[in-house]
Amino acid sequence: KVQSLLQTERLMLNILQRMSGIATMTHRYQQALIDAGTHTRVLDTRKTTPGMRMLEKEAVKIGGGMNHRIGLFDMILLKDNHIDFCGGVHNAISRAKEYCRTHGKDLKIECEVRNWKELEEALAEGCDRIMFDNFTPEDTRKAVALVAGRCETESSGGITFDTMIPYAQAGVDFISFGALTHSVKGLDMSFKAAGSDKLTIK
């Protein structure tokens, strides 16, 4: 009914504009990495709009990107606070593995590293993916060489569209961008009635 369309017009447009903006921005990032001759994939983060995570993550996939974890339940990501509270990378990964064994969970474990010592500890303990946090492109290249295919690699931390190519060329498997969902600009859309001159209002 016309009334229903008018009642939901703004809600529909708000969602379509935001999700289309996310998909468009993701496509722009991923296509630029492809055009640069790299195999690096674009990842989103959990920095999503409250209540709209699933829609926003679906928009990222539509745009050609990949989803990082959906929540705390489908992957273990050991960040700086986890590492510091545990007393180091070795302890953090070890305790995460023990948690999975104890609770019968088959979860991938990713560990953030901030320096070479933490990288060496992560490689020694073993995990599924290592995130290089705030590494320079040059250090990222060295880190990827040190990992030597033993696990997946990811770059993160203040990387933008203008600075991402050198990181991808350094050989990382993934680059994560919080901006895809927390700083995106919605597309300009409008809702117009077609053939309204033929309608009869009763």
What are these regions (language model features)?
Residues 1-112, 117-125, 129, 138-146, ...:
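Acidic/glycine-rich phosphate/pyrophosphate-binding loops and surrounding catalytic core
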Residues 134, 157, 179-180:
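Short secondary-structure boundary segments
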Residues 161:
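Cys/His-rich Zn2+-binding cysteine-cluster or related metal-binding knuckle/ribbon modules and their
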Residues 179-202:
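Short, charged, intrinsically disordered terminal tails
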